[in-house]
Structures are given as structure tokens and as C-alpha cells.
């Protein structure tokens, strides 16, 4: 691993850890808000990614198999954090548990087959990459076909769903091309270029999630409220819906 690659990993780790710090600040600001526990759960995404990049910078989990270098912690990070990203999108869309589990499993299998392709050669490499690509396509089917059909007719929920869906969907179009062009594929770009690109994409895909959730927190709270109403739980007091106050109240940014 070259010095430039190590530097790229450290820079990504710092970016993710800053993201965790921002999450902590937002968590404190949302004291008393029903959105607080959701924000804490979202912190797992930049937090786990940051720890993974620290390990990658230290060379932990990087092995050579059949002459190919596998950055193991990169794939461990992806198999943990990216299913959470798409699962959260499904939850925001009001999707069923089965659909959310389906998109998360498809995401994890995409990562697993991609990792297997890295350490394979010849026809097997491209066959495994093809299987990974099929799972990648299935993710877009969930994001752009299945999930949109079940979103409540609420502008805030639809707006947040569209933001998250397009943020992840557009960024993830780049990943298979980086893989193809990099050392794992045809080798058009080197390890340094691939490492820099992956680090940039990872940070851009994950850290802003906390901000998106905070900026449109009222829409996410509405998801919880609408589900409670659908189950017949209804308002808790006097037949009136709870009134959002303090940091839960809608703002111009919402």
C-alpha cells in the first residue's frame, strides 16, 4: 500500500469521524425530540465507516489472494453500512418489513459477490461481477419501482424519500465503473486513483445522511405517526394529534 493510498484512507477516516461529531451535536440539540433515537441509529453509518477506514489506513484486513489485493475492511464496511442506507430509504417510504429486508439482503449480496470477484480470475471473476451487477440492478428496482408505490401522499415524506433515493442512487452508479476501471477490473486506473475515488464516494454517500435527516426531521417523524395511525393507535390525548414543539416544529428549512 502506497503512501498516497494510506493518506486517502486517513482523510476519509477523519471525514467520517467529523460526521460522527456532527451527529453528536445534532443529537444534543434534539433533546426531547422523538427523532432523537432515529438520529442515534443513523450515527452507526459514519461511525462504523470511520472505524473501518482507520483500520484500512493501518493495513488491517488487507490481504493478497491469487495476486489480487483485497481491502477486506472496505467490503466489511460496505456490507454493514450500505444495507442500512437502503433500508432507511425503504423505512421512510413506508415499505413493508419484507421489502426492506429484501433490499438489504440484495445490497449485502451485491457486496459479497463483488468481493469474491476481486480475488477470482478469468471467467469466474467476470461471472461473479455479473452476479453482483444483477443485485445492483435489483437495488434500483427497489428504489425507483417498488418503494415509490407505497409512499403516503404527503409532500414532506415524498420529498425526503426523493432526496435520499436520488442521493444514493446517483452516487452508486459510479461504484461499478470504478471497480471495472481499477485494479480489480481491467486495470485502466491504478490503486491510488481507485482508493481516492472510493473514499470520496463513501464519504459523500454516508456523512450527509445525518444532515438530511436533521434538515427534514419533521417528515421522518410523520412516518412514525402515520404508521401508528394505520395500526389504529391514534392520538394519545383527547383525540388530538400531538403538536410538534421546539426542535420538532417545522421550520422554513423543512
Curated annotation (Swiss-Prot):
It is found in: Cell membrane. GO terms for biological process: phototransduction. Residues 27-35, 94-96, 152-154, 224-254 are cytoplasmic. The chain crosses the membrane at residues 5-26, 36-57, 72-93, 97-119, 124-151, 155-182, 191-223. The keyword Membrane applies. The keyword Transmembrane applies. This is Sensory rhodopsin. It comes from Halorubrum sodomense. The gene is sop.
Amino acid at each position: 500500500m502506497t503512501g498516497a493510498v494510506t493518506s486517502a484512507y486517513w482523510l476519509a477516516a477523519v471525514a467520517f469521524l467529523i460526521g460522527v461529531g456532527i451527529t453528536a451535536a445534532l443529537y444534543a440539540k434534539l433533546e426531547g425530540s422523538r427523532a432523537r433515537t432515529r438520529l442515534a441509529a443513523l450515527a452507526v453509518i459514519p461511525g462504523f465507516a470511520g472505524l473501518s477506514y482507520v483500520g484500512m489506513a493501518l493495513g488491517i484486513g488487507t490481504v493478497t489472494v491469487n495476486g489480487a489485493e483485497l481491502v477486506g475492511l472496505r467490503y466489511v464496511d460496505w456490507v454493514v453500512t450500505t444495507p442500512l442506507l437502503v433500508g432507511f430509504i425503504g423505512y421512510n417510504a413506508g415499505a413493508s418489513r419484507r421489502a426492506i429486508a429484501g433490499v438489504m439482503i440484495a445490497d449485502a449480496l451485491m457486496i459479497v459477490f463483488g468481493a469474491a470477484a476481486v480475488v477470482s480470475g478469468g471467467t469466474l471473476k467476470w461471472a461473479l461481477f455479473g452476479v453482483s451487477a444483477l443485485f445492483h440492478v435489483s437495488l434500483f428496482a427497489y428504489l425507483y419501482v417498488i418503494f415509490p408505490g407505497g409512499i403516503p401522499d404527503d409532500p414532506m415524506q415524498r420529498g425526503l424519500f426523493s432526496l435520499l433515493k436520488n442521493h444514493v442512487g446517483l452516487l452508486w452508479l459510479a461504484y461499478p465503473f470504478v471497480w471495472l476501471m481499477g485494479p480489480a477490473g481491467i486495470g485502466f486506473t491504478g490503486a491510488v486513483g481507485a482508493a481516492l475515488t472510493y473514499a470520496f464516494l463513501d464519504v459523500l454517500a454516508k456523512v450527509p445522511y445525518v444532515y438530511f435527516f436533521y434538515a427534514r426531521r419533521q417528515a421522518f417523524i410523520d412516518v412514525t405517526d402515520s404508521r401508528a395511525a394505520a395500526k389504529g393507535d391514534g392520538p394519545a390525548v383527547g383525540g388530538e394529534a400531538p403538536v410538534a414543539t421546539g426542535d420538532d416544529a417545522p421550520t422554513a428549512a423543512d
